[in-house]
Amino acid sequence: MLSLIYYVLATIICFVLYLLSWIAYFLTLPFDKRRVVVHFLSKLITDTVLGIFGRHVVGAENIDRKQAYVIVINHVSMMDIMSIYPLPLVFKWVSKREVYKIPMVGRLLYMHGDIVINRASTKEAMQLVHTRGMEWLKKGASVSIFPEGTRSKDGEIHNFKAGAFILAKDAEVPILPVVVEGTDNMTRGRFFMNWKNRITIKVLPPVSKQDVVERPIKEVMTDVRQQMVDALAELRANKKK
């Protein structure tokens, strides 16, 4: 019963905020170059959907609010996109084309200016991420990317693709590693909510612009992945205590 009430109330609130997002989008588009207002309304939507699970941010002190980053995040659930909105940054997502077909979600991503890619064409996708990513980074907005390229089926962090790291190097911006834990355990079965579940977002120290520019991409990519693997293991160990 509680799950049903949650779904109904969350749907109503999200729909109202969705309508407000359209209004804000048209009113602020001429002067809001980073689409901060729409981003804030999306944060309210994610607070409605995920706030009940007690999202906890660890390592927020590693973020410079005035800096644009390439954010790299592990990917285990569709909720990963919603999970990091507590971070004090305006960011644009790189997301597969199929997500844009989801009612409301696709339109919201469009209003954000998120980067939609066709994973069937790797070369085209990489070019689009690079071009649009550079545009947003120059405007001062961060770009969020799942470096594994797809959702992990076993919850572990697998090999990274180089796209996010090439973008950061060419744009000369720091890389901000973020590890999310708990988004894959929000429900019991297909419908009932797991009310005891908690979501933790751990922000790791960024890779400096100097390191991104001067060090080999493969080396940076390997180091960042290992840091994220270690951080995820630590979060899981702490959760069992």
Walk through the language-model features, giving the residues of each.
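Catalytic core of membrane glycerolipid acyltransferases/transacylases, capturing the structured
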Residues: 18-39, 52, 65-122
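A short beta-turn/loop motif at secondary-structure boundaries
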Residues: 61-65, 193-194
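Short gly/ser/thr-rich secondary-structure transition/capping motifs
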Residues: 51-58, 126-127, 183-185
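Membrane-interfacial terminal anchoring regions of lipid-handling membrane enzymes
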Residues: 1-27, 36, 61-63, 218-241
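Non-catalytic C-terminal accessory region of glycerolipid acyltransferases
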Residues: 127-241
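Hydrophobic beta-strand scaffold residues
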Residues: 56-57, 116, 143, 175
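Generic preference for hydrophobic
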Residues: 59, 71, 93-94, 201-203
